[in-house]
């Protein structure tokens, strides 16, 4: 975290509840995203009323899936650095890691955990899709 956890709890999350209230009142769903690893704050974020999480690779997807995978949506969190510079085996291992965690959770959406760099080889993206399609079949 960029700031001490106590600061987030005192100033940030208290305001999130206020910020989210009108959205909840209108029946809207809220997906939370943040740069970096917010695993330590997942209970605080959830208490603010979010309905799901979009995660970067630094966030512990397995931990979040264990705690909230049956009740919340979560999106992520394949590492784009592997997509950028990894070979077929590394890409397959990364997609498999995400799918092995996510397939137990009804609200899982497989996605990369950050932006795909412009210089990512197209072939690597095709490998990612091929492996995902193979593993996504139930």
Give the predicted meaning of each segment:
Residues 1-138:
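Active-site loop segments of alpha/beta catalytic cores
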């Amino acid at each position: 975290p960029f700031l001490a956890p106590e600061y987030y709890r005192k100033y940030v999350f208290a305001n999130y509840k206020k910020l989210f209230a009108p959205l909840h009142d209108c029946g809207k769903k809220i997906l939370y995203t943040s740069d970096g690893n917010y695993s330590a704050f997942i209970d605080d974020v959830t208490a603010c009323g979010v309905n799901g999480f979009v995660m970067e690779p630094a966030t512990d997807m397995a931990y979040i899936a264990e705690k909230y995978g049956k009740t919340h949506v979560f999106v992520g969190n394949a590492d784009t650095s592997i997509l950028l510079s990894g070979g077929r085996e590394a890409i397959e291992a990364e997609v498999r890691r995400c799918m092995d965690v996510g397939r137990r959770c009804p609200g899982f959406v497989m996605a990369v955990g950050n932006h795909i760099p412009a210089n990512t080889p197209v072939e690597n993206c095709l490998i990612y899709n091929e492996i995902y399609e193979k593993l996504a079949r139930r």
